Each structure stands twice: as structure tokens, then as C-alpha cells.
Amino acid sequence: MNIVFLDSTAIPKHIPIPRPSFPHNWVEYEYTSVEQTIERAKDADIIITSKVILSREVLQQLPKLKLIAITATGTNNVDLDAAKELGVAVKNVTGYSATTVPEHVLGMIFALKHSLAGWQRDQITGKWTESKQFCYFDYPITDVKGSTLGVFGKGCLGTEVGRLAELLGMNVLYAEHRNATTCREGYTPFEEVLKQADILTLHCVLTETTKNLINQETLSLCKKGAYLINTGRGPLIDEQTVCDALKSGQLGGAALDVLVKEPPEKNNPLIELAKTMPNLIITPHIAWASDSAVTTLTKKVTQNIEDFVQQLNQK
């Protein structure tokens, strides 16, 4: 059984994927471009990948392929319809980051509310050493307790964020779907959440309905100075509109772990703005990546492969 891992650097080097127990030939590459995919995977029975694009055109040229094992939850890099037509199974992994993503969100909440990035940036330039007083007050500090958190997406991650936030004394509102005709128990109408929330955190699935969920219209409904957190999917926000809202003060700050294009272009407006705006925090899509989460992920990837091969051998 030939197994090809096309983008091994999507997993930290100190936590390798356990090798399957059945006889196999394992080949891995740190990165694989679109142009390299077919040549590298032409003899593969199993492909392991996180983000390498496997289009219909590519899959049609991989006649030996039986399984695509995704080292993530999202499968948008694979043409699922083509895979099904060609008899190629696709297995992803869910639930591995149910602790680390909510913790990352809480860290972002504290960082924004206490202006931690601004204070740290000042120490790099030596500002405190030049102060006439034992402290100075250049950035706002507001309490997390008593703040209202608007959660968009009430799956396992959004629910856990809400649970932890309530333990901190925050008022948590779960947003109903935009344009919903009725409001379910345990939810608050979409526009009301925008109006009431001091902090917005995005955990919804990316669909045509949720794409650009945070746009000029929705931001205009928010409290002036509200904070935005996105650890969901980059396209949930309109990036230029968020930049404009930060510059105008409509948003008091933002903490983003995901962008529309990853890795981003050097001239990405948010990346450029973060160089000069201390209340804009960007992390490189690592909210999921605690050691325990990655360990769970790698074990589940191997288990997916083991289960598939076992089923294959039983046919």
C-alpha cells in the first residue's frame, strides 16, 4: 500500500503522524504545489493532505487512489463530487480542537480588552524606560467581566466559548441565523446580537449564506468600538471593510486567526494595517494547534487509514 503525505509541514515536526500497522510504503513531502501533485501522487493508494488542492482534473489522473485522508476538518480542497464518482473515499477529522480553539478565543478576548499587544509593542521600542511615572496610560483597559459576547455559530466550539465566557462573568448571546423568520430557544435575533455585543466571535460554517457575514451593513449595526474575533473561516469577513472599520473606530479592535487567502499576500490590507495598529492582532491559523490537539488529530488520521484498509480487506 503506497501512502503519500503531500504537505507534512501542516503538522508540527515534533508530533509526527503514527505509521499504520499494515505493510506500506510511506513517502512524504513538506510542500506540494498544484504542478507537482500528479507526479508525486501518481502511484498513491492513499494520499494524506491538509490543504493541497485535489481537483477533478487531478483526481482523474490518479487511477490507483483509494483514500484521501485529510489532516483537518475542512474538505474544501477536495472535489468531493469527483472523488465520489471515481470511487475515492475522503476521510477528515473532527473534534480534535474542542479545547484549544476556545482557549485561543479567550486569550484574544483578554488581549483585546487589556490592549496587551499595544503594551508589548511599546516595550520593544523602549517607551516605558522613558516614562516619567511608574506607568502610563496610552491604551484602553476594560474589564472582561460584565461584557456581552455575541457568538455566531453554536456548534461545539461556539458552545464551549460561551460556557467559558459565562464562567468569567460575561453575558453570552448566541446569534440566530441572519434573515431567520423565527428565533429558536436559546438564541437571540441576529441583528440584536450585533447591536448588543461588546465582542463578536465567529464560529459558523462557511457557506454562501455566511460568506462576508461581517460586512459594511452588519458592522454599521454594531456598537461603536466593539471587538471582532474570527477563528472560524477567513471569508466570513469582508477584509477591506474590517480594515475601514478599524481605521474609523467603528471596531475598537480585532483578533483574527484566519484570512481569506492563506498564506496571505504581502499586500493584504489586514497584514499591512497590523504593522501600525496595535489593536489588530493576527495569528497564522494556529488556534487549533496545541500539542494535545495535534496529537489527537494525528492519531485520528492514522485510525481513519487503518479503518479504511481494514474495511477494504474485508470486501
Region locations from a protein language model:
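N-terminal glycine-/charge-rich "phosphate-binding" loop or analogous flexible N-terminal tail
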Residues: 1-44
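Rossmann-like adenosine-cofactor binding region
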Residues: 54-59, 178-269
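Glycine-rich Rossmann-fold phosphate-binding loop(s) that bind the pyrophosphate
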Residues: 154-155
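N-terminal Rossmann-fold NAD(P) dinucleotide-binding loop
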Residues: 158-159
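Rossmann-like dinucleotide-binding domain for NAD(H)/NADP(H)
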Residues: 231-315
